Amino acid sequence: MAGSQLKQLKAALKANGLIGQTNIKKKNKKSKTPSETRRNDKQEILSNIRKDFNLFDGKINRTKRDVTMIQGGKFVKVGSKQHSDATRAKSDVENSMKLQYELDKKQHGKTGGLVDRRFGENNRNLTAEEKMLERFTRERQGTSKKKINFALGSDDEQDDEDNDGFVLTHSGKSLSLDNDLDDSKSNTKYYDEDSLMPEEVQPKRKSKQEVMKEVIAKSKFYKHQRQMEFQKAQDEIMNLDDEFGDIMTEFNNNPAKKPQSFSNKTPEEIEYDNKVRELTYDRRSVPADRTKTADELQKEHDTRLQKLEADRLRRMNGDYDDREAEADDLEGFWNGSEDEEEGFAIDNSAEEEGSSSGNEDDMDQSKPSGRTLKKTIIQIPGTHEDFIASLSSVDESNHCNYIKKVIETYQPRLAEGNKERMNVFVGILFKHILHLANDPCPPAENINETMKILKKLSESYNEKLVEVIRVEINDIQERIFNLQPRDLVYFVMVGYLFSTSDHYHLVVTPTLILMNESISSIPYDKKTTVSRIGQGLFIVDILLNYQTFSKRFTPEIVCFLEKAALLLIPEPEKLTNQSLSINKIIKSDTNLRTKGIKPTEDLVKVSELFGNDSQVLKLKLTNKLIDIFARILSIWRDNEVMIEILSSFSNLANHLSIHYNSPKLNQLIEKMSKIQNNLIKERKPLTLQHHKAISIATFAPKFEENFNPDKKSYDVNRERQELNKIKNQIKKERKSTLKDIRKESKFTARQQIADKKDKYDEYHKKMANIVNSISTIEGAEKNTYEREKQRRKNK
């Protein structure tokens, strides 16, 4: 085992020849003692011994596995002595940079110290004797108090002042060097402009380097100005902060003003003040709007329609505000299109088209011009049962007139609470239309007129209407497998009253879900009746009306049309199910017979959809099915899935044309084939992205015949080799210097940012303390005022 630290130290000193006998004659002259040849290396040997014995100064990183890294251009093991030395050197550099930054920060903005202004101190071209001689001469000239009266090198003005106006002259001319200089200047003042060449007149164009130097100089100048202004502002802030304490002391020392005593007014004066205050808020008379011309009214109407159309397009694209939907948002949704009522003959579409673009002028023609209140003779119903009871005493042809009279009597401007009554009445009208639709023989004219009135009223009163519609949606959901005539009329009314092209709607969206669920619930089996198929076709026609503007694809429609066609066309078992979504084709009683088929153009009535099955109803539904196929071609023509849709529809249409001879069907088949061929040509299959082929780079290997790993250059010219060596050294030193400069600048920038953060934090903390102190004083004064007020009030 090794001895103690003292024994190890003595052994190391003796081994290096620093202690013990040193005059022993050694036969081996290679290892000589320091006293003989290495006396100058004594300090180096001692420093190495100290490093070996000061083990706590070295940092050793223990690693699980041996890892090497490049340190100083060499491979160094991580955690070894070389790596620790490099890490220590790096930390020493950072510490020195930090100390230098702190020193510069302390000396920033300070003046003082000794400046050596002796002559020639920084001039290396002068010898020591020349410097001393020049200094002695200047010292003698400065200490000499006696001045020469006539100095040839002095100015005339100074001579006149110093010599009482006497000037050294010769032949009447002053002997001074300034005159000669002036003469030389005056001689060169005049010149011949024609003798100058154009090249001499034109200024020299600056090089790019000169321009960049000028830009950098200006940038530094402006940056220095900004720093000076910022420093000046900081000094002013510090001065204000120093004076703030004195200001607050003065404020606190000032006695608080006594609050004014409460005025003791008489009851008459208080009443008079209240009357004056009431008159202040009275509404003053304003000039009435002038009567507008017909052109101006038409222009306003067109502007309103354009705004409603723009809002409809925005809602169709799903551009909504980031707020919750409200019932009042339905105000702008009543701009339903008249084209959305096409399809089954349940009402008079021509009258609806004429009334949809109108306004409430026809309703207001019978109104009096004044604002006098009428005597309420007609009672507005509160429930649907009361409304039916009131209509029982009125002739059926006058039901619409009775409704108009109720609306005219209970206008919101006539009495308070009429708006709430009208909201309830609109919901009653909606229920009444559905009630009429359930009659065995519904009055079509009354239903159409009532729907027109309801459309106009729904623009102003829609709160209760939305609640009634949601209740109706829940009722239809419960009887989804056994629909009633009122349910089909409800689907039509929603498309008539609301805008169905919106991306999301409070009423239309739940109705769409309900309609899709209804047609999806119709099964493809032998138990399905013709009436159920007709109800599904009716709902599909309404769905297509809903999507006239938005043209959204609905997969439930395609699936149901395939099932309906297979249940109606004759001999469906002869079809192949390759292009159909149905796996097994069945034959049902609902299929048309192969004999006695006569195409018809008659429309289907709603009452027929809830009657008995017949051959005539099957023919009408087949004709309606062909019309729906044609509408799908026009609505979904630009859809990407149209090729797959047409592949199934074209097979069904071709099979139907064998037994159902109709010009409409033949035109449909021809149109389907053209559209399908065009879409197939336009469709491009997905392909990978094509890139230009890049060849593999090849290089011819270069071999040196006289290769030597110790040689760094194979240049024969010795001078050029030395020059290249110097250039490489300069380049290496330049890169190293730039690296150090960048490192130092980054370190300085980090330190400056940290100082600014500390300064800002200190400033904000100080301002927060000031604000808190002011708030405390204000709160105390407020509490004092409240206590005084309460004390006087209790007296």
UniProtKB/Swiss-Prot annotation:
Biased composition (Basic and acidic residues): 33-42, 182-192
Biased composition (Acidic residues): 154-164, 349-363
GO biological process: maturation of SSU-rRNA; ribosomal small subunit biogenesis
Molecular function GO terms recorded: snoRNA binding
Compartment(s): Nucleus, Nucleolus
SUPFAM superfamilies: ARM repeat
Keywords assigned by UniProt, alphabetized: Nucleus, Ribosome biogenesis, rRNA processing
Region Disordered, annotated ranges: 20-42, 147-209, 281-310, 349-370
Gene Ontology cellular-component annotations: Noc4p-Nop14p complex; nucleolus; small-subunit processome
UniProt-listed InterPro entries: ARM-type_fold, Nop14
Positions of transmembrane segments: none
Any Pfam family: Nop14
Domain of life where this protein originates: Eukaryota
Subunit structure, as described in the record: Component of the ribosomal small subunit (SSU) processome.
Function: Involved in nucleolar processing of pre-18S ribosomal RNA. Has a role in the nuclear export of 40S pre-ribosomal subunit to the cytoplasm.
Family: Belongs to the NOP14 family.
PANTHER family recorded: NOP14, NUCLEOLAR PROTEIN 14
Protein's name in the database: Probable nucleolar complex protein 14
Species whose genome carries this gene: Debaryomyces hansenii (strain ATCC 36239 / CBS 767 / BCRC 21394 / JCM 1990 / NBRC 0083 / IGC 2968) (Yeast)
